[in-house]
Swiss-Prot record:
This is GMP synthase [glutamine-hydrolyzing]. NCBIfam families: guaA_Cterm, guaA_Nterm, PRK00074.1. InterPro entries: Class_I_gatase-like (IPR029062), GATASE (IPR017926), GMP_synth_C (IPR001674), GMP_synth_GATase (IPR004739), GMP_synthase (IPR022955), GMPS_ATP_PPase_dom (IPR025777), NAD/GMP_synthase (IPR022310), Rossmann-like_a/b/a_fold (IPR014729). It is an enzyme of class 6 (ligase). Pathway: Purine metabolism; GMP biosynthesis; GMP from XMP (L-Gln route): step 1/1. It catalyses: XMP + L-glutamine + ATP + H2O = GMP + L-glutamate + AMP + diphosphate + 2 H(+). GO terms for cellular component: cytosol. The gene is guaA. The keyword ATP-binding applies. Residues 9-207 form the Glutamine amidotransferase type-1 domain. ATP binds at S235, G236, G237, V238, D239, S240, S241. The keyword Plastid does not apply. Its EC number is 6.3.5.2. Transmembrane segments: none annotated.
Length: 525
């Protein structure tokens, strides 16, 4: 029997901050399981989860407004430690008898907090000392409202020049509020504060580790599927690859992977997937060459969302046909990860907007009565990569730049044709090869080439050519919500451009995209 890796757990109530998932990832990094729920949960749900501690996230609302989100009253009666972050601190203060006011001045960016009262949350943690010998902490603020009076049974632990209550605490009840964001890297000692709360104050053990997550997943897969057969759509991406390796470890040859080669993959990617998973790891893989079918379906379609939906529809059709050929398959495996679960829950409650349609397996034929196996559904992407390494998958594959589900279908602008895909594949491969050679690949967050359906005049030797244009795109980002274009060296860009134009017959011009996000998105379509 494996350890119960869910025995100690933290509940994070989400008030809408862009950083909330980061809070959860930090808690997981500390080796403790946590879940992220909407703020309006019931007492019964909290009791059922039985957390060792609760974190109230930040959020964009104002506690001074009527009908603004509030923590359930039971949070403060559950007998477990509570940490309020930014908005979470403000609603804690207001609900427990303090006072919050709107401010004409937003405090956004770095601040230095001076600790004036001893507290279990920050004891022994400091970045520097004040002239009076008090600990100073470099933190990241992002708030408009501020607490102007703390509840009567709380003490002020720390303050800044403009924020009199930067940290408040009720040590007896183990309630803590911080006006800054400990989860972001700009708060230099933030992870230590979260560790103090989660590991010391909430007394959680570090049971959530890659090796134990794998053991737990394998055991749960075996319990769920028994001696049945399982089918998985393997794309070669991180999520489906790690799902395949977990299932293979759990049930061996009773897993069948279906790899649909849609003709929209990167250079040599289909061969690499078959070599790695079929020849090297010995998985049972059905290779379905379907390039012509996808390109026929995409003929005449130039609108991005229509292309996405067409690619998704044809994928489901092809996958369904292959699934029906297999006998006695009772389960469908999917590489759903925890952010997908969070997004689905938000969509179901009307708290999120769909910006782009997701490319995923769905709509299996009604005659196929299959159960769903989702071994990654509790994991964030960084956790999936770590267990992939533990399972033996190569680092370069797990830490590749993101690649869209529809593949080159949304990197060829306008109508998708085989000629365009072939040119783009080779241009993209040269760009990535040169990034790796110059030790720049891991210094940018994402890099790729885009095919532009416009012709441009060029000169080759004594002749003129009238060929296609390719754009290079490279960005730097922390969360992919915002991004800066990567300032790659001019000589590097010149070398990439020369190679693409000289080595690929059909491309006469290379341009570099210098648009940030916002206003542009990272992908062109």
């Amino acid at each position: 029997m494996t350890d119960n890796i869910h025995k100690h757990r933290i509940l994070i109530l989400d008030f809408g901050s862009q950083y909330t998932q980061l809070v959860a990832r930090r808690v997981r990094e500390l080796g403790v399981y946590c879940e992220l729920w909407a703020w309006d949960v019931t007492e019964e749900q909290i009791r059922g989860f039985n957390p060792n501690g609760i974190i109230l996230s930040g959020g964009p609302e104002s506690t001074t407004e009527e009908n603004s989100p509030r923590a359930p009253e039971y949070v403060f009666n559950a007998g477990v430690p509570v940490l309020g972050v930014c908005y979470g601190m403000q609603t804690m203060a207001m609900q427990l008898g303090g006072h919050v006011e709107g401010s004409n001045e937003r405090e956004f960016g770095y601040a230095q907090v001076e600790v004036k009262t001893d507290s279990a949350l920050v004891r022994g943690i400091e970045d520097a000392l004040s002239a009076d010998g008090n600990p100073l902490l470099d933190v990241w603020m992002s708030h408009g409202d501020k607490v102007t009076a703390i509840p009567s049974d709380f003490v002020t632990v720390a303050s800044t020049e403009t924020c009199p209550f930067a940290i408040m605490a009720n040590e007896e009840k183990r309630f803590y509020g911080v006006q800054f964001h400990p989860e972001v890297t700009h708060t230099r000692q933030g992870l230590r504060m979260l560790e103090r709360f989660v590991r010391d104050i909430c007394e959680c053990e570090a049971l959530w580790t890659p090796a134990k997550i794998i053991d737990d997943a394998v055991e749960r897969i075996r319990q769920q599927v028994g001696n049945d057969r399982v089918i998985l759509g393997l794309s070669g991406g991180v999520d489906s690859s790690v799902t395949a390796m977990l299932l293979h470890r759990a049930i061996g040859d009773r897993l069948t992977c279906v790899f649909v080669d849609n003709g929209l993959l990167r250079l040599n990617e289909a061969e690499q997937v078959m070599d790695m998973f079929g020849d090297h790891f010995g998985l049972n893989i059905v290779h379905v060459p379907a390039e012509a079918r996808f390109l026929d379906a995409l003929a005449g379609i130039d609108e991005p969302e229509a292309k996405r939906k067409t690619i998704g529809r044809v994928f489901v059709e092809v996958f369904d046909e292959e699934a029906l050929k297999l006998e006695d398959v009772k389960w469908l495996a999917q590489g759903t990860i925890y952010p997908d679960v969070i997004e689905s829950a938000a969509s179901a409650t009307g708290k999120a907007h769909v910006i782009k349609s997701h490319h995923n397996v769905g709509g299996l034929p009604k005659e196929m009565k299959m159960g769903l196996v989702e071994p990654l559904k509790e994991l964030f992407k960084d956790e999936v990569r770590k267990i992939g390494l533990e399972l033996g998958l190569p680092y370069d594959m797990l830490y590749r730049h993101p690649f869209p589900g529809p593949g080159l279908g949304v990197r060829v602008l306008g109508e998708v044709k085989k000629e365009y895909c072939d040119l783009l594949r080779r241009a993209d491969a040269i760009f990535i090869e040169e990034l790796r050679r110059a030790d720049l690949y891991d210094k940018v967050s994402q890099a790729f080439a885009v095919f532009l359906p416009v012709r441009s005049v060029g000169v080759m030797g004594d002749g003129r050519k009238y060929d296609w244009v390719v754009s290079l795109r490279a960005v730097e980002t922390i969360d992919f919500m915002t991004a800066h274009w990567a300032h790659l060296p001019y000589d590097f860009l010149g070398r990439v451009s020369n190679r693409i134009i000289n080595e690929i017959n059909g491309i006469s011009r290379v341009v570099y995209d210098i648009s940030g996000k916002p206003p542009a998105t990272i992908e062109w379509e």
